[in-house]
Amino acid sequence: MREDNPNWFLRWEEELPSPEELIPISQTLITPHLALAFQIGSPNHHLGSKRTTAIYHQKLQSSTTPTTPTPTPPPMMMNSDFGGGDSTDLGSGSIGGEPARTLKRPRLVWTPQLHKRFVDAVGHLGIKNAVPKTIMQLMSVEGLTRENVASHLQKYRLYLRRMQGGNGNGITGGHVIVSDSATDRLFASSPVPAHFLSPDYLMPPLEHSYMGKHVITQQNQVVRNLRYEDSEYGHGSMKMLKLFPAGN
């Protein structure tokens, strides 16, 4: 048919509508009443174009700008304080990549009952030659350490020296002895054996190695004798005092 009419393209072009008859692309095909009924707002092409451009520039800027890592706050130190006082650190070091945490053991509180047990043990050994290890064995208190006994023994010897001097504070051997009211009240809760105040009993321990071994041998014999007596009258088992009893 196109071969029969060579001017078909010109006729088709003449039949096309003029630009004035064409509907602009920006014009909506929905009537205002219909758009209001369906709550359809008229699109704002300029506003959408501006938003798209702003988002594009924001993403481009974030990709080119180096990001600085957010500093993490240092981890807090976990301090477990049992007993409400000074305690001993058990160790340090990093565990699992975390910084060292201060671990503390329960603080020992010397009660009048515990001090009386200490005085009884020192009475068997003698205040002059009593050593912390043997005192700890005689006391037979679970949770009591050698350091606890050594510190208490030193304070008790100073207390006896103050009592021998007849004053609360004094000077012995060139050293000023300062009394502690709380410690003195604890020591006064148990009667002091009379022979503890003898000058011979307040002498320092023997420093000769042979004599020191001899004293330790005698103290070990005292421990064995006490255990034998306890087995005879206590049905074969020593009474163990628990310093930190477990909960029910």
Swiss-Prot record:
Q: Name one Pfam family in it.
A: Myb_DNA-binding
Which cellular compartments is it found in?
Nucleus
Sorted alphabetically, the keyword list is:
DNA-binding, Nucleus, Stress response, Transcription, Transcription regulation
| Gene Ontology BP, a term | response to cold
Indicate what this protein is called per its UniProt record.
Answer: Transcription factor MYBC1
Q: What does the record note about the induction of this protein?
A: Induced by drought, salt and abscisic acid (ABA). Down-regulated by cold.
Q: DNA-binding region at which residues?
A: 102-161
Q: What does this protein do?
A: Probable transcription factor that acts as a negative regulator of freezing tolerance via a CBF-independent pathway.
The molecular function terms of the Gene Ontology recorded here are:
DNA binding; DNA-binding transcription factor activity
What SUPFAM superfamilies does this protein map onto? Homeodomain-like (SSF46689)
Q: In which tissues is it expressed?
A: Expressed in roots, leaves, stems, petioles, filaments, stigma, pedicels, sepals, anthers, petals, and siliques.
Naming one, the record's GO cellular component terms include: nucleus
- For whether the record's keyword set contains Nucleotide-binding, the answer is no
Q: What happens when the gene is disrupted?
A: No visible phenotype under normal growth conditions, but mutant plants show increased tolerance to freezing.
Its practical application is: Repression of MYBC1/MTF1 promotes Arabidopsis plant transformation by Agrobacterium tumefaciens.
Species per Swiss-Prot/TrEMBL record: Arabidopsis thaliana
Report the main location listed first in the record: nucleus
Annotated signal sequence range: none
InterPro entries in the record, alphabetically? Answer: Homeodomain-like_sf, LUX/BOA-like, Myb_dom, Myb_dom_plants, SANT/Myb
